[in-house]
């Protein structure tokens, strides 16, 4: 069992929280290792104590980015186990809400007796097999044996669901099943329940499955949260919307639609060449994106706006016609001792475009973070940075006469950077310049040293600034960054 999960359940016990792991008891070993969700049914009287335990152990609440998809009585909390470098998902249920995955339209009000039947298992408290099996059959019928589920290609149990059914079926007593149905699920008689169990078998005739599906929906009509017609329409519409997103967005996954309830975070990862920024950023995105809305923004090389494309196109035509030579002035690391030559007005104009694009990227990133998403920025404009990602025109102009046009371009560029506020969390990867030169062999030593030295020699202070020793291994740096990010949510 992972350390965080062990602490969590010990705390639940010491606080007297009434709970049980209400489903999927066939795979509790995976849940104890953080591989599966912790699906917990919580007594209403234990709600405050339960929330207190989550808060003390650093769990954060998330919800569906589209509020209409949020199911009442079901909440999601995530914690970070630093030892295993895993996110732990606690799926907290205060009500037994069942149904097709798209809508969950049925409430079976047997929470109290379900919890009363629970006992301590190998890992967690689990319900009596007869209660779990009864609810499992209802869940599978609503999920796989309705007309719309069958027509949507979801009319059969998955391999994992079939294993779970076999696991539970071996542990139940038919006599006790009958008692559960009679005493707690009176709308579901034994004959209908037997038909439902038979309809879930692999070779059950189609007509038997459909008939049983219609009968159980009729038996559960008093448990519906919405009318049947609305439920079917919502399932159809959401399935259609998901299919469209999969076509439009190649990497679309349904799971990554959650955002943080208390707001997301704008995180900037900065560092010189060879500091391992790319490894850290890719690792963070890979870690968060299966669970949450996650966005990666390259502030060093921002996406070109239509204005930038137009202006750069005009400048390219001018260069092709021989109005001015090609220059790369922005890449020269000049200072007062080495002012260098004036790169030409086109280079200054391009810097204004870059400043504007960085500002637009920042605005987009900030909006997403405010909506609860995680936004990971590769580099970031900072006041103390000269060579990387800040205003460049004054430095590039050097000793060239400071005429009105240069001053105008400089003011335009500076204005965009003034509107860019600091990120919620700034992670500075500091690596020794000599080490950076060794790591970044595909660039010139002078180029790498100048950019890395600026990070290395700066005095980084501030409540949102955290310096990370990037001389360590890549995995150590990544793990440290993950821990900082989660702690600052």
Each predicted region: which residue ranges?
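Conserved lysine of the Walker
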Residues: 277
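P-loop (Walker A) phosphate-binding loop of NTP-binding proteins
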Residues: 272
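ATP-dependent small-molecule kinase phosphotransfer cores
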Residues: 302-401
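Conserved NTP-donor binding/palm subdomain of two-metal-ion nucleotidyltransferases/polymerases, i.e.
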Residues: 1-36, 42-265
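A glycine- and Lys/Arg-enriched "phosphate-lid" helix/loop adjacent to the NTP-binding pocket
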Residues: 379-457
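Hydrophobic positions on the alpha1 helix immediately C-terminal to the Walker A/P-loop
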Residues: 280
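NTP-dependent small-molecule kinase module
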Residues: 214, 218-238, 428, 433-489
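Short beta-strand-centered segment that lines the nucleotide-binding/catalytic pocket of NTP-utilizing
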Residues: 290-307
């Amino acid at each position: 069992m992972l350390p965080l999960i062990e602490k969590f359940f010990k705390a639940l016990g010491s606080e007297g929280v009434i709970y049980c792991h209400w489903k999927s008891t066939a795979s509790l070993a995976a849940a104890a290792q953080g591989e599966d969700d912790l699906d917990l049914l919580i007594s209403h009287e234990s709600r405050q104590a339960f929330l207190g335990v989550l808060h003390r152990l650093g769990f954060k609440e998330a919800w569906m980015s589209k509020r209409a998809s949020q199911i009442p009585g079901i909440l999601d909390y995530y914690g970070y186990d630093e030892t295993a470098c895993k996110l732990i998902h606690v799926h907290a249920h205060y009500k037994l809400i069942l149904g097709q995955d798209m809508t969950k339209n049925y409430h079976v009000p047997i929470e109290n007796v379900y919890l009363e039947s629970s006992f301590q298992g190998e890992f967690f408290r689990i319900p009596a097999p007869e209660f779990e099996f009864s609810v499992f059959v209802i869940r599978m019928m609503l999920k796989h044996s309705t007309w719309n589920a069958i027509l949507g290609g979801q009319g059969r149990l998955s391999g994992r669901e079939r294993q779970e059914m076999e696991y539970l079926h071996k542990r139940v007593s038919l006599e006790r099943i009958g008692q559960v149905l009679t005493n707690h699920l009176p709308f579901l008689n034994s004959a209908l329940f037997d038909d439902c169990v038979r309809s879930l078998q692999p070779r059950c005739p189609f007509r038997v499955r459909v008939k049983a599906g219609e009968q159980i929906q009729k038996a559960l009509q008093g448990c519906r949260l919405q009318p049947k017609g609305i439920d079917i329409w919502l399932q159809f519409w959401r399935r259609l919307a998901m299919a469209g997103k999969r076509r439009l967005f190649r990497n679309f996954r349904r799971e990554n639609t959650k955002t943080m309830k208390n707001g997301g975070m704008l995180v900037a990862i900065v560092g010189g060449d060879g500091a391992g920024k790319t490894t850290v950023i890719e690792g963070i995105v890979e870690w968060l994106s299966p669970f949450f809305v996650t966005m990666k923004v390259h502030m060093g090389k921002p996406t070109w706006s239509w204005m930038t494309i137009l202006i750069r196109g005009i400048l390219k035509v001018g260069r092709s016609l021989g109005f001015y030579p090609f220059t790369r002035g922005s890449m020269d690391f000049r200072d007062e001792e080495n002012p260098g030559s004036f790169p030409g007005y086109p280079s200054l104009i391009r810097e204004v475009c870059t400043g504007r694009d960085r500002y637009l990227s920042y605005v987009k990133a900030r909006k997403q973070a405010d909506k609860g998403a995680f936004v990971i920025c590769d580099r970031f404009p900072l006041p103390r940075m000269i060579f990387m990602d800040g205003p460049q025109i004054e430095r590039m102009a050097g000793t060239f006469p400071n005429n009105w046009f240069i001053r105008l371009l400089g003011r335009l560029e500076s204005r965009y950077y003034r509107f860019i506020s600091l990120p919620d969390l700034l992670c500075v990867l500091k690596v020794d310049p000599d080490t950076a030169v060794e790591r970044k062999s595909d660039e010139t030593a002078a180029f790498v040293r100048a950019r890395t030295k600026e990070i290395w020699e700066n005095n980084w202070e501030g409540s949102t600034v955290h310096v990370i020793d990037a001389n360590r291994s890549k995995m150590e740096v990544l793990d440290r960054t993950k821990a900082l990010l989660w702690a600052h949510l």
